[in-house]
Amino acid sequence: MVLSSEASSAADHSAAAPIPTSSWPQLLGRLTEGKHLEPGQAGWAMEQIMSGNARPAQVAAFAVAMKMKVPTAGEVGELADVMLAYARPMPADLIRDDTVDIVGTGGDGVNTVNLSTMASIVVAAAGVPVVKHGNRAASSLAGGADTLESLGVRIDLGPDQVARSLNENGIGFCFAPQFHPSYRQASVVRREIGVPTVFNLLGPLTNPARPRAGLIGCAFADLAEIMAGVFATRGSSVLVVHGDDGLDELTTTTTSTIWRVQAGTVDKLTFDPGDFGFARAELSQLLGGDPQANAAEARAVLGGAAGPVRDAVVLNAAGAIVAHAGLSSRAEWLPAWQDGLQRAAVAIDSGAAEQLLARWVRFSQHV
């Protein structure tokens, strides 16, 4: 490793900082000229989108122009804050303040197995509370929600049910369409555009449970630092990761780049899994299939099957445990990784991960 230096309610949103008067021609004009937006303008645009006042063409133009201009952390933070203001609220008194998320932007175009989904179960089985935010597949064959559904987990639970799942099972799943109904129009436009836009960054930044820690995958190396900047302003303990093979995960085929966010600062590192004894994998060994195939792979890995997929799951689970450890100012990088890797492996080999999945399935079907 080398260090290189649904809306909560209209009332809730009205309590936010005032958004300056703007217009789509003014805003899009700045973006097409390659200029950054004035403070508040990105928030104004997202308010128009979430309130249903933006037309599809305006949403599409904004999404693409923002990506081409390259957004700033401030702009992306405004988009995420407005989206969260419209999200269905979680019962804050039931959500622990040390929860983690393991999620990626998607958009890497590789169609791997659902590593973050499997890793989430392993992390929860290791004793770290997980509230995962996710959706169905946009471009791949199976998204995290698709695979969880094939495993038997009900994905359409509401806020109180997810909170109960977290408290009783150590894990919960926030299905994005269930928690962000006001984002529906933008979601449709995003699918129709068919290319990555600034909206790809918002999923990992808008978990309605607002976890303070996480392993966040970013398929876009040029935008990962921007995401890290948003998390830094929130005081999060997060590892934003980009596989140097293009994956929005910690990869085992080569090195990964990590933006370590802790105590409001961002450090950029190169991470080599070989330093911890992981064998190099071929990308083809990590490829997935449809939801049923990915669910079968998940059952095998959680049941103790060895191989490249298990290695990648353990690595990503350990990364989330490291991020969780970063909530403490006493956490040290190498010892945290050694601890995380051991806990992830034990969670699988002891049967704890497999048992947790079974409990989660039973709970979700009867809640």
Curated annotation (Swiss-Prot):
GO terms for molecular function: anthranilate phosphoribosyltransferase activity; magnesium ion binding. The keyword Magnesium applies. Transmembrane segments: none annotated. GO terms for cellular component: cytosol. Its EC number is 2.4.2.18. It catalyses: N-(5-phospho-beta-D-ribosyl)anthranilate + diphosphate = 5-phospho-alpha-D-ribose 1-diphosphate + anthranilate. Keywords: Amino-acid biosynthesis, Aromatic amino acid biosynthesis, Glycosyltransferase, Magnesium, Metal-binding, Transferase, Tryptophan biosynthesis. Pathway: Amino-acid biosynthesis; L-tryptophan biosynthesis; L-tryptophan from chorismate: step 2/5. The keyword Nucleotide-binding does not apply. Binds 2 magnesium ions per monomer. Gene3D superfamilies: Nucleoside phosphorylase/phosphoribosyltransferase catalytic domain, Transferase, Pyrimidine Nucleoside Phosphorylase, Chain C. GO terms for biological process: L-tryptophan biosynthetic process. Residues 1-22 are annotated as: Disordered. 5-phospho-alpha-D-ribose 1-diphosphate binds at residues 104, 107-108, 112, 114-117, 132-140, 144. Anthranilate 1 binds at G104, N135. Mg(2+) 1 binds at S116, E249. Its cofactor is Mg(2+). Coiled coil: none annotated. PANTHER family: ANTHRANILATE PHOSPHORIBOSYLTRANSFERASE (PTHR43285:SF2). Homodimer. Belongs to the anthranilate phosphoribosyltransferase family. This is Anthranilate phosphoribosyltransferase. The lineage of its organism: Bacteria, Bacillati, Actinomycetota, Actinomycetes, Mycobacteriales.
